[in-house]
Amino acid sequence: MIKFTLQWAVLLGMVMLNTLESKAQNSNYMYRIAKIKVDSSQLENYKLALQEQMNTAIQLEPGVLSYTVVADKKDPSAITIFEVYANQEAYQSHITTPHFKKYKETVKNMVTSLELIDTDLLARVHQKEY
């Protein structure tokens, strides 16, 4: 329970920093949390594959708006990714791209569990640049 609470506290802290935006302003955005457990012996390889996929998606897909990735300090193989897409269609397009398919194929034997959580934005605050 403590680990779960810590992960949520970290995510909330990352998205709540300075300027409040209402849900209505971003009503089409898709916010997803991916909770991933990685085989600890494969963690470095996993991080490389994830970084490559994220960089490519951000460069090539205008509908992929943001990735924030955190690891549990007590269990670095417990990874949480906060993903933001322009809309559901952008996400559906994303998961059909060659770079996403390459990522999934590369990490299929590294990931021991995956939970995807679709969320609704309640509030978002941030510094203009951080």
Report each predicted region and the residues it spans:
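Glycine-rich beta-strand-turn "strand-cap" elements at beta-sheet edges
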Residues: 4-8, 16-30, 68-75, 104-130
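N-terminal targeting signals for Sec/Tat export/insertion, comprising classic cleavable signal peptides
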Residues: 30-60
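Acidic/polar helix N-cap motif
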Residues: 39-42, 75, 87
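An amphipathic, aromatic/His-enriched active-site/gating alpha helix that lines ligand/cofactor pockets
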Residues: 52, 56-66, 84-118
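Short glycine-/small-residue motifs
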Residues: 78
